[in-house]
Swiss-Prot record:
UniProt signal peptide: none
Family in the record: Belongs to the UPF0297 family.
NCBIfam families on file: PRK05473.1 (NF003997)
InterPro entries associated with the record: IreB
Name under which the protein is recorded: UPF0297 protein LSEI_0786
Pfam families: IreB (PF06135)
Amino acid sequence: MSTLDQTVHFDFRDNNPKNVHETLETVYKALEEKGYNPINQIVGYLISGDPAYIPRYNDARNLIRKHERDEIIEELVRNYLGKEQA
């Protein structure tokens, strides 16, 4: 059987929520260092999808764009509620 005929298993958990956490920490620090209100800027980005809310400083914009917004929101809600990923 060729590899093209085999079903590949995708596990969302392979995206490692720790990476989302680390990304948010880095973005938060970059926003703080630039003098912005980090919470307002991150919320603005998550609601609008506009990367202009996140500075390029310390590669913060590129880092946050590596994650889907719904993935970031999922991690935030899970963390807020103290729930582990199933």
